[in-house]
Amino acid sequence: QPWCLYTGKHLFSFVDNHDVVRAYTALQNKDKIFNMYAILYTMPGIPCIYYGSECAAEGDKSDNDYKLRPCIDDVDKNKRPDLLRFIQKLNAIRRSCRALSYGRYEKCVLSNKYMCYKRELDGERIYCAFNISGENVTVRVEEAEGTDLLTGEVRNLNDIYLPPYSVKLFRKNI
């Protein structure tokens, strides 16, 4: 990609790690966590989840890093079961869609409240749409129909309706 400094490389990507404030702690609006992980799993790169983050573990980098690295037994694994299920689903989707791991990236729509891009490889096209606002939005992509990878529903993709803070992933075989 012309915008990419490391063209052809598969770089390691993360939203938090042992050196920075945990993602769930950093977010003022916790509803945005789903967008964060969906972007991590669908953008170019190799996604990495720092242990405990799949369960919404919190940790602030104050005087030292100890709060960022709790004993795994101390992480509340039932805090956000919806987040854990969502990340498991993203793992399965990424494994089943080669375009998400190796495909080219192309921006479709970009604003400060929502965005849509596509990943494409060998006849597989994945549309990734995100709404980070508290308002309903509709994204136009000019495509016939595709399969919603999160629900399995087959639908028309001309207008993708995005409720507040939502993620939609669609596969279009071309």
PLM region spans:
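Short, solvent-exposed coil/turn elements at secondary-structure transition points
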Residues: 54, 78, 152-153, 173
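C-terminal beta-strand-rich structural cap/linker in extracellular carbohydrate-active enzymes
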Residues: 156-174
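Solvent-exposed beta-hairpin/edge-strand motifs
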Residues: 142-152
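Loop/helix patches that line or flank the sugar-binding groove of alpha-linked glycan CAZymes
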Residues: 1-143, 162-164
